[in-house]
A protein has these predicted regions:
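Positions that flank functional sites
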Residues: 114, 132, 257-258, 299
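C-terminal coupling/interaction segments
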Residues: 269-322
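ABC transporter nucleotide-binding domain
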Residues: 172-267
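Hydrophobic/anchoring residues in structured secondary elements
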Residues: 34, 250-253, 296
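ABC transporter nucleotide-binding domains
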Residues: 2-4, 9-205, 209-211
Length: 322
């Protein structure tokens, strides 16, 4: 639906983006994750045509954004980091104004605005001046203006920043609902937000796209497999036996309520799966040590983010074995 191809952006001698390429398919919520200054806002400004790239190409529904700016921008709704609101206008009047700017057919504006007001939960404040609204409602109005003209793609720049916990939950629910009928790209520096809402994640670091994957791929891939097991055998006998397995890199004993049951965390070579589990079962059968629980764990988004943004950062997974 919308795609960046080898996009670079320079401000004089400063390179804000370097050779960034990615695609947001139709009907997906895509999260752009990165620290402050990573290049998230620059990326979104280029995606929406507010900034031209120094080099590279932006395609919207197969059309080049620079060559077909008018047609492409009709397909994009944009919520910048600071919503473009007019405090002296009422919510309803403002949305009518935005519809006129986007050249919505005049006979359809009234019904279109009321539909947006309902979708964004603004019915109770539609008659009020925007300047008198709370931060949460102002953000809802910002999302609402991005829906004017019924664009196929919504681009939201840190839509929950500065909101209180209840407002954050409400805006996230709204984004999830919009994702059912739109392609949504939104930026955030909150890991939990990306995990909760997105089908796909992109990690930017210092202007470079360091990581790109579906959330399902993230759950299923990784160099390391971790197994958490509860085994009916004393720790002193069990740990040396587990360490003898070729596929096991590290073993850590976890606290238990009884010495007859051992709780362990195993770090195994992911390339050995499913052989790792087979080796474990054979070993424990030979030791007459029943397995009470076996849970497979994968790399978290936090682990991937730390690895992508700082090669020298401590690995929280590795730390768990200390």
């Amino acid at each position: 639906m919308i795609e960046l191809k080898h996009v670079t952006k320079r401000y004089g001698a400063v390179e804000a983006l370097h050779d960034v390429s990615f695609r947001a398919p139709e009907g997906q919520i895509v999260g752009l994750l990165g620290q402050n200054g990573a290049g998230k806002s620059t990326t979104l400004n280029i995606l929406t045509g507010y900034l031209p790239p120094t080099s590279g190409q932006v395609l919207v529904d197969g059309m080049d954004l620079l060559q077909n700016a008018r047609e492409c921008k009709r397909l994009i709704g944009y919520l910048p980091e600071k919503p473009p609101l007019y405090d002296e206008m009422t919510v309803r009047a403002y949305l009518r104004f935005v519809c006129e700017l986007k050249e919505v057919q005049k006979s359809a504006i009234a019904a279109h605005v009321e539909d947006i007001i309902r979708t964004c939960g603004l019915s109770e404040v539609a008659h009020r001046l925007i300047g008198h609204l709370s931060k949460g409602y102002r953000q809802r109005v910002g999302v609402a203006q991005s829906l004017c003209g019924n664009p196929k793609v919504l681009v939201l720049d840190e839509p929950t920043v500065g909101l209180d916990p209840r407002q954050v939950v409400e805006i996230r629910a709204l984004i999830a609902d919009l994702g059912k009928t739109h392609t949504v790209i939104f930026s955030s520096h909150l890991l939990s937000e990306i995990q909760q809402l997105c089908q796909r994640v992109l990690i930017l670091n210092r202007g470079h796209l360091e990581y790109e994957a579906d959330m399902q791929e993230l759950a299923e891939t990784g160099e390391t497999l971790r197994l958490r097991a509860s085994i009916a055998m004393r720790e002193k006998q069990l740990i040396p036996a587990l360490r003898s397995l070729p596929c096991v890199r590290r073993v850590k004993a976890l606290p238990t309520r009884t010495i007859e049951i051992s709780e362990v965390l195993l770090e195994c070579d992911a390339s050995a799966v499913p052989d790792a589990q087979t080796q474990l079962f054979r070993l424990l059968c030979g030791l007459d040590a029943p397995i009470r629980m076996l849970v497979e764990e994968h790399d978290s988004l936090e682990t991937v983010f730390l690895r992508a943004t700082d090669e020298g950062a401590k690995n929280p997974v590795a730390d768990s074995f200390k």
